[in-house]
Amino acid sequence: GIARRIVDFASALIDFVTGALGCVSMLACMFFGALTGSGMATTSAIGGMMIPEMKRKGYDSSYAATLVCFGGIVGPIIPPSLSFVLYGASTKTSVPDLFKAGIIPGVMIGLVFLMVNIIICKRTGTEVHKPELGPGGERIPMIQFWKERLHRVGKATKDGFWALLSPFIILGGIYSGFFTPTEAAAVSVVYSIIVSLFVYHDMTWKDLYKTFVSAAVLNGVTSFLLGTSTVFSTFMTFEQVPQM
């Protein structure tokens, strides 16, 4: 439910350009990556919705999959990022500083991918849009076009408000000192559960149980990697390997 509302919001912003679905996929990956901090979760959630739709619009299957995979890479660069938390814990680097360092590069990479997608779609003739023309091919005034566009963006923002609010709560809490980056992960999970169960009603208690089981398996793998990498990092420091 949260992923679908993020896609609807991204679609309202940019679905009038050439290669709109590809751009929506990339933009949705950026938003969803900022919400979850996980490239795997971003690719799975957005790809499951957008790849079949892109194929129906004439996109090549491999191109559609590649586009979503790139979006899954960009999403975790934009804070809050699980990769940054793991890197900071392993190398004793400040996680808030890593988050700050990831904002501009993440946004810039995402915008470059958007432009590349538009150029490729123009060259291949895939999903070419002319925003000045209406559904029947009639020319519409630009004032009317932007008025309708703003109305749609406003509606999508209202519908997806609670989903879009999550990154601001997480980052605001971290930078204000209200909670640590580690605690922010717990806040994000609790917030998402509350929104999905009681606000959007998109998740059942049975779905929540399955989610907990899946998360436990993934966290087991991640914890093992983090533990071994921390031991290896400490060993390298004690043996002064970087100074050799």
Roles of regions detected by a PLM:
Residues G1-M244:
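Alpha-helical transmembrane segments of multi-pass membrane transport proteins
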